[in-house]
Amino acid sequence: MKVSKVYTTIDAHVAGEPLRIITGGVPEIKGETQLERRWYCMEHLDYLREVLMYEPRGHHGMYGCIITPPASAHADFGVLFMHNEGWSTMCGHGIIAVITVGIETGMFETKQKFIIDSPAGEVIAYAKYNGSEVESVSFENVPSFVYKKDVPIKIDNYEFQVDIAFGGAFYAVVDSKEFGLKVDFKDLSAIQQWGGKIKHYIESKMEVKHPLEEGLKGIYGVIFSDDPKGEGATLRNVTIFADGQVDRSPCGTGTSARIATLFEKGILQKGEIFIHECITDGEFEGEVLSVTAVHTYEAVVPKVTGNAFITGFHQFVVDPRDDLNRGFLLG
């Protein structure tokens, strides 16, 4: 065996959605801001993403993270997230997993509040403890807002409307009933197909761009909303993002975008609890902490709560003789 690269990771999951935290083998990442660091990774470190997200080391639904030094003077650390298509701007389930893993493995000190630099902006996370274990993690996300509502869509003789909202990334929100589908495993393949069609349709018709950050643009995912199954849940959802990737969790940034749409419609009030259920029957708890503005858009600061579990400690190698050493994806 010949080894040209060695990577170490700690893997975790949040309501079934994986997070692979890369703890060793990462070269220096250049950039003054976290957004600049994201661009650097896109230009120079995409091979690392492919090696650790793609098969045979990962899979189509794998999600990853690199913990960086803080980009701002008052933050504890920074995060960069990756998936099957590229490098994302924020990831809510990732924040929950990073805080849990960092505390339970001794990477982070045992404290309640953490300030995190993400490409989408500053995120504040809070750990709730049960003895020495992390019981749950809450995070105050970046200001989230409805970008456009009631956007008309016409695809394959179907006519319907979506709301476009930002929760750290841009999402289109649609009711699964528009297609006669339920948010369950049986209808998942059809939902994935619709997710890709809706994303491509919107991006062919309009430019979706954050009013203050040039680097935050495009539809990241499509949220399919449905009636809940569990007692006490408000809504059920599945998010299709990146290249047809399925979020197993309720999706942290998607939940933030959903909170923004519900608040804008008057369905969710400040301080009310919103229980967002996912396709694995897991739940995130969300609420509106405060009301603010992003440029000319009314926005909310959402709080999202969930829990994570460590699944493994791994060491991966790259053999230069292996024709598949950068990995591959089967959709």
From Swiss-Prot:
What domain of life does the native source organism fall in? Answer: Bacteria
InterPro entries, alphabetically?
Pro_racemase_fam
List the GO molecular function terms: 4-hydroxyproline epimerase activity
Q: Which family does it belong to?
A: Belongs to the proline racemase family.
Name of the protein in question: Uncharacterized protein BA_0901/GBAA_0901/BAS0853
**Organism per entry:** Bacillus anthracis
